[in-house]
Amino acid sequence: RRIDTGCKNLYGIMSQSGQYICINSAGDMYHIPPRCIVLNMANDEFRVYDFPATYNCAYHNRFYMIGSSYSYITSTYTYSAHTISLPSLEASEGLADYNAANETIMNMQSPYAIYISPLSGHMYVSDARSYATNGYVYEFDRQGVQLKRYLLRGVNPGRIIAM
């Protein structure tokens, strides 16, 4: 099937919660801004949001995302955090129950992944920092309070996978 969302440059890892998929649209990095698309796979309907979903995950009927918006015009990144509740598709700024983590995340040099453990409910966010330095993975509890920061030597922490 082909579904035309009207959004440019669908890019990145998608996350799924039940019948819903969260997809990032990077835009053109010049004049077309990034977007977030949530697709209902049961009926092919979708909703487009005016913020990026570059790094996203699903947990307890919500999509949590850190958006990364790059501009070739200014050569800068802008980061944002949003949550989309399911099935209402209501979007809000910040990371809902994890809002206490927002300040730490927005102060990261280069947020690069987000994951919430289905077992503990702890949220993990990586800071790649740069492509030439060691990165960090931050662990937050269910209220968004930082528990630990793990140094990853020689690794750019771009994906978090539960094993």
Summary of predicted features, one role per range:
Residues 40-44, 85-90, 140-145:
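Short loop/turn segments that connect beta-strands within beta-propeller blades
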